[in-house]
Amino acid sequence: VSADAPYSTYPELIDYCKEHPGEVTMGVEVGGFTYMMVKSFEAATGVQFNLVDVGSHSDKCTALLGGHIDIMPNQYSTAKGYIESGDFVALGFPAEERSAVYPDVPTAKEQGVDWLYNGYEFGFFLPKDTPKDIQDTFDTAVAELMEDEEVQQAILDLGNEPTYLSPADYESQLADIQTEYEDLWAAANAEA
């Protein structure tokens, strides 16, 4: 949010939104990851935003800086310069634990808000007819790569946390995310 917003924590935002339903303008990419993230927040907290499609992560920063939106979900790495300059305030992070990348940003849970949301998921996908031995070789190479300290630091420097999941675990996680998205999408369409 902008540094001059009337809220600087999740509880303050929730209280403000409940007092001003539909008035807080949230910049998203409709149908994209941040849209689903916002719909998840609305469902968990009972608030309602005025959602505006403003485009990419950098477009959201421009819109917030220009006062065209009131709040945005964004990657910390994209907004970091604005946070450091004092233009933006990070309300929090929807995770169980604070991030190693931005340890000064409290979690929603720490602020008393019962809301968790999966972070940005990056993974490798191979054509479905890729032979099993090639899949296994690729997986072993990725697992070894993710143990390399230089690779881990490079990922941290980009504002992400390095993690590795086996193909089976990643497939299971994606199935859970798909189910969550389908539920959120159905609820969003029911509102329209």
Language model segments and positions:
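Ligand-binding pocket segment of bilobal, Venus flytrap-like solute-binding proteins
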Residues: 23, 28-105
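Hinge/capping helix and adjacent helix->loop/strand transition within the periplasmic-binding protein
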Residues: 1-59, 110, 121-154
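C-terminal lobe and pocket-closing loops
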Residues: 78-147, 179
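Structural motif detector for alpha-helix initiation sites
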Residues: 9-10, 105, 167
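Conserved functional loop/turn residues at catalytic and ligand-binding sites
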Residues: 9, 67-68, 87, 112, ...
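An extracytoplasmic/periplasmic, membrane-proximal ligand-sensing/linker region
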Residues: 44-45, 132-192
